[in-house]
């Protein structure tokens, strides 16, 4: 089991695709390049339609990072980041996306039944 988990976290391995709006976004692994604590765990590249996630993350950080980057994709594809819109400044976007991600992750962790319920209701 442990070996399988390590294999899943290899650099360059495409985990899956996620549909965000009209785009199919590839989710891939990338070797950690952290040089300071403020470096990010992941990145959404709207030009390439790729979400990159660092390989050295715990399962919880990996889930949080993926949700965080998906929310960046939703904000971008729905034009919330263009001039005059609520998230038109990078600082505003990051604060809002981070707070919503962390809030949702806490709700999901505290209410284990919720994701299954939502999945069942959206068939």
Specify the residue positions occupied by each region the protein language model found.
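Active-site recognition of the HExxH zinc-binding catalytic motif
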Residues: 64-76
């Amino acid at each position: 089991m442990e070996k399988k988990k390590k294999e899943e976290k290899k650099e360059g391995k495409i985990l899956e695709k996620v549909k965000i709006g009209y785009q199919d976004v590839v989710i891939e692994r990338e070797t950690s390049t952290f040089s300071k604590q403020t470096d990010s765990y992941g990145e959404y590249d709207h030009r390439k339609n790729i979400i990159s996630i660092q390989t050295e993350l715990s399962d919880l950080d990996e889930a949080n990072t993926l949700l965080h980057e998906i929310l960046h994709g939703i904000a971008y594809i729905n034009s919330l980041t263009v001039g005059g819109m609520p998230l038109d400044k990078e600082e505003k976007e990051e604060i809002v996306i981070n707070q919503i991600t962390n809030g949702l992750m806490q709700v999901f962790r505290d209410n284990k039944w919720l994701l299954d319920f939502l999945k069942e209701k959206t068939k």
